[in-house]
Amino acid sequence: MAKVLVIAEHDGAKLNAGTAKVLACAGALGAQAIDVLVCGTDGSGLDTVCGQAAALAGVSRVLKNARAENAAPLAAVLAPQIADIAAGYDHVLGPSTTFGKDLLPRVAGLLCAPAVSDIMTVLGPRQFERPIYAGNAILTVTVPDGSKVVGTVRVASYKAVGEQAPAPVEAVSANAALPTHTRFVELRAGAKDRPDLQSASKVVSGGRGVGSGENFRLIFELADKLGAAAGASRAAVDAGFVPNDMQVGQTGKVVAPELYVAVGISGAIQHLAGIKDAGTIVAVNKDADAPIFEVADIGLVADLFEAVPALVKALP
């Protein structure tokens, strides 16, 4: 039976929700053991993150890799360490997020192993399904015998695992030469009190129909009323209404909330590819022929400038 190493994503204080979904994928492998590797520096909240990982169902051990060079999650610095620690494992998995997509291919290269991206279904220990062509086709990938399996997991395809009695936390170290050509400069992030877009259970997104960046206050007001994250279509981002970290879709962020509200979004194929795993989709658009209504569970043909304020007022 396989041994799986899951790479935890965190911000130094809190474990990213995607890690719990990667564990669900790892569990589908029927593994003998599933260990979670947490990289960071001592005194930066690393112990808290390790505790959060240890409490997730299915975790056998949490491996704490603390060193000063891990103060920032630089893929070039983390990859050699992970490749060394992964020596005794059959599978190395991480989330298919910006972090995971940057890190895991490097790990695969160092291990001379195939890299499988966007795993959405486990068919067997070495066989997986992944989406292609904006999710319109599913590709079956088989990893040859004799090599490790290194992959990123499409977190939108899995539900987070539950909790368990805490697993043991063990300190580990890597015998790896670290590169010096990459250095951390600074982290800039916009201040926001809303949930993370990719892990939120509710998302409200606006499209080009919103008309302007100023009008996006309507999207933010509705999102805040619902306790939801705020997103946008590519058209709204390209028009400069909002920053590109809000983009939902094939070329943006793939989301799988329980509730997705699309306001003024026509429903381009690349946007629909990013919300295909959403639970309930609600669409508000004045164009009754908009493609978004073909996938919506609830559709409201109305002027968003009248409908959204009315919804905000009606919500408790």
Outline where the language-model segments fall.
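N-terminal glycine-rich FAD/FM-binding segment characteristic of electron-transfer flavoproteins
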Residues: 1-316
